[in-house]
Amino acid sequence: MFKEFKEFAMKGNVVDLAIGVIIGGAFGKIVTSVVNDIVMPPIGLLMGKMDFSNLFIDLSGKGYESLKAAKDAGAPVISYGAFINTVLDFVIVAFVIFLVIKQINRLKKEPVPAPPDTKECAFCCSAIPIKATRCPHCTSEQK
């Protein structure tokens, strides 16, 4: 059983998948930082010095000053600002993955089609081997 697991784990696809997951996790952290630290502050500034990560709806109706204060008090809140950041995070990751896949597909060479191995008999229209000098169906001589 251990031998089977070792063979499975050492297959190229499993190792490639593991590397992809690790790199993807690290890339996700970079994108989250880009969204939270670079993209959202200018957008917040344009919208009147708004910090999206602190946007929330207080479901208790007590009117907390900040999201942190509401969470510290245990009040039920909808943190829609964090949701906006997460959506932007996803859109950026999806767009970058799209660009990477598009470039990879552009660099792939189209496979050269194999030359035909059959031809059509000019007399009986049967498919015959390309090297045939006589048709096996009608026995006509081929050029």
Curated annotation (Swiss-Prot):
GO terms for molecular function: mechanosensitive monoatomic ion channel activity. InterPro entries: Mechanosensitive_channel_CS, MS_channel, MSC/AndL, MscL_channel. Its main location: membrane. GO terms for biological process: monoatomic ion transport. Pfam families: MscL. It comes from the Bacteria. The keyword Cell inner membrane applies. The chain crosses the membrane at residues 14-34, 81-101. The keyword Transmembrane applies. It is a multi-pass membrane protein. Keywords: Cell inner membrane, Cell membrane, Ion channel, Ion transport, Membrane, Transmembrane, Transmembrane helix, Transport. It is found in: Cell inner membrane. One of its GO terms (cellular component) is membrane. Homopentamer. Belongs to the MscL family. Channel that opens in response to stretch forces in the membrane lipid bilayer. May participate in the regulation of osmotic pressure changes within the cell. PANTHER family: LARGE-CONDUCTANCE MECHANOSENSITIVE CHANNEL, MECHANOSENSITIVE CHANNEL MSCL. This is Large-conductance mechanosensitive channel. The lineage of its organism: Bacteria, Pseudomonadati, Thermodesulfobacteriota, Desulfuromonadia, Geobacterales.
